[in-house]
Amino acid sequence: MVKTVANGKKKPQKVVKKQQKTQKKHNQQKLQKRNTPTLKQKLKKESKIVKINELAWKPVEIPDNFGDFGGFYGLEEIDGVDVEMVDGKPQFVVKGEEGEKSVSNENTTTNELEDGDDIEVDEGEEIAQQEQENSDNDELIEEDAEEVEEQQQHGEKELEEEEFTGFGDDIAKEEKDSDGAKKKLNSSEDIDELKYNAFANLDLPLPNDDEIDLPEWGEDKIETCLSPYILNGLSNMKFTTPTPIQKRTIPLALEGKDVIGKATTGSGKTLAYGIPILEKYIQSLDTVKRKVREKVVNHPTGIIFAPTRELAHQVVDHLNKIAQYSPLSTKGIVSVTGGLSIQKQERLLSFGPGIIVATPGRMLELCQNDQELVKRLSMTDIIVLDEADRLLQDGHFEEFEKILELFNKNRPKNDKSIEWKWQTLVFSATFSRDLFGKLDKQQKQKSVKGNGKALNKADSGNSLVQNDEIIELLREKLRFKDKAPSLVDANPKEIVSGQITEALVECGPLERDLYLYYFLLMYKGSTLVFANSIDSVKRLVPLLNNLNIPAFAIHSSMIQKQRLRSLERFKDASEKNQTAVLVASDVAARGLDIPNIDHVAHYHLPRSADVYIHRSGRTARAGKEGVSVMFCSPQEASGPLRKLRKLVASNAANNKNQKINVHSDVKLLPVEMDLVSQLRPRVELAGRLADSNISSTATRKENSWVKQAAEELGVEDLHDLDEFEDDIIKKQRKRQESKRLDKNEQKRLRFELRELLANPIRKNNRRSYLTSGLQNLAHLMVQGTHHEDVLGHEKVKALKDLQKNGSKIKPVKGDDKMKRIAKVNQRKQAKKDAKKDAKQKRQELRHGHSNKSEE
């Protein structure tokens, strides 16, 4: 179409098309402005204060490759919420659309209507602006009325088309609103997920019995007592054969009887009490469903008490693996331990989990703060004591006794659906008379009758108490339901697992580091080293790291997060490297199931026999073999070692009149002294560096503490405080300062240590020829059987080396050999002391002469 302007000239077609494109583009911009919120809309969205229970907390999904995620358990998060402190109390403020989504029961229909009204007002304003701009554009169009009308009609058609697309945007908006409603619905579902996840799988269909093949579980009629859910979990976990303790205790526990179970470490005691609890819960599914419909919080089926936090979390993991195909989901098994958020644990307990694994301290704290919680927990069906010997001593029993008293007082007496007393299951690897004597001080001097005969002092040498005595001691404290609880001893003639090979390394008291390094260098694998003090643990870790051996620490002074991180790092290092070491105090001696522990090394002899048994039980688990090595000085061999071996070996005797061979099961570890002499300079340098690091750290902490105390007391001159210090403290400080090294000295020692570590150790000091000596090194290298760190030595394993070359300890009357070694060491020490005294006297004389000359 040809268009004309006012002066009669024809307007080019390109100009007309350009104007049409400009107008179309402007209309599109107008539609885009409709969807953008105005300042008025933003100001209308007011902040709202909500309660913490109304927020849509979402559980954080932790990937499997993160392990325990730095020690966080049951972490939850919330988005779009601000926290403001008003009068010392937190207030949760919700702002914007994201904040509205963070509220669980929020209805935002009124806000959406208000936003719609704002959109209509804004649309009218934009249309007026558009008409004004169109009037400016009309000045460039010709005066021909028909053509102007045609252009206007054309523009209206374009507007109608744009408005049609705008209608499509409205539809899209409605779809978006519907998606938002779905998101709100999903968010509400996420809110209730934590609450109802424990009952989400109640209608789970039964597995097919034909797919489950566990013939050995059916030998003792255990399979007929178990549901297909549990059998399916056992089949998938490859637990095809029940252990002796499981065969004998599971049927008794399923019958509702009180059970006292004793078995060696690593024998499957967790499943021995875990399977009956899971079965009890599955049998009560109908009651659980009814209470869920009535919105009544269920009482727990079982409460398991563990002495340590790590053991409690480990029990939860094991039960979750077995229950992964059962109606009880992972949120139905809850751990209640110290070191984690108590508010989080209160919220989890308010949802009614089926199984609770707790430490006594945190459980008592929760029960004292919430009476309703005590009433619900007191209705439990089963109470389990795992590692009972530890749980009933060292202050744990006072807390546990208070919990039992609260449960007894609050347990309903007239409820027919609940038995008058809960079922009690007690499991441990050791039941010693000395340990149980601490429970009842009044009976320390009294004899407890068993089998109609009074026990006298002559029988006190046995490591285990008689069966009747165990029941008598436990009955008064634990208040069993049955008059005669069933006692099951799966290993009556074993106190240490038969899969553990016990060994001994004879060394001086100051040579433990040297022989420990020799053991770790010669025998590759993962090793758990136990020490009696936290200071020794802190010293050994840097010493081994200086020797290029990856070492990690775990002790009671570490917070829970640090302990779990050390365990995860040790597991990762043991998978990547041939040698990994975890140095621990006795906090890791009980219950922990750390996979693939090849050796357990006792850097110090334990203070009691039960600790030695549980320490050694960290290896040779689940039917595997392991090695337990003791580093013993002559002073320890003459006293503590003999008592320990007598206590352990006494239980292996068939009858009381049989002669006990104290050293029958202990072998001497073969030690090559030529290799030890080459390793000595390395250990000395690494020890000096480790001592320097520890002393500087201790001095730094002490100085910071003294400065802080002086500032609080207003003391300016710190030198005056030295006059009031004790002489012992001054000596300790001088001893620490003497071990400190300056930076240049540390650099020099580290350089020397690197040079020594770079040079390989050579067997028999061989230097030149690969084929010389008794061992053909070239042949070993071709076959790939040579030792990586010792030239001329083949690869060896501690277990095989002990079986081939390990010699049994010959008990010489009076231990003449040990006494001779002790005398030699005493003479050497006496000579050193005499030299020091003579040196001090010479210095005093010189100092006295110099003072006289000055006068």
From Swiss-Prot:
Ranges where the Helicase C-terminal domain occurs: 515-668
Q: Which keywords appear in this protein's UniProt record, sorted alphabetically?
A: ATP-binding, Helicase, Hydrolase, Nucleotide-binding, Nucleus, Ribosome biogenesis, RNA-binding, rRNA processing
Bias regions of kind Basic residues — which residues?
Answer: 8-33, 820-830
Query: What name does the UniProt record give this protein?
Result: ATP-dependent RNA helicase MAK5
Key word Nucleotide-binding present? yes
- CDD domains listed in its UniProt record: DEADc_DDX24 (cd17946), SF2_C_DEAD (cd18787)
Q: Where is the composition biased (Basic and acidic residues)?
A: 831-855
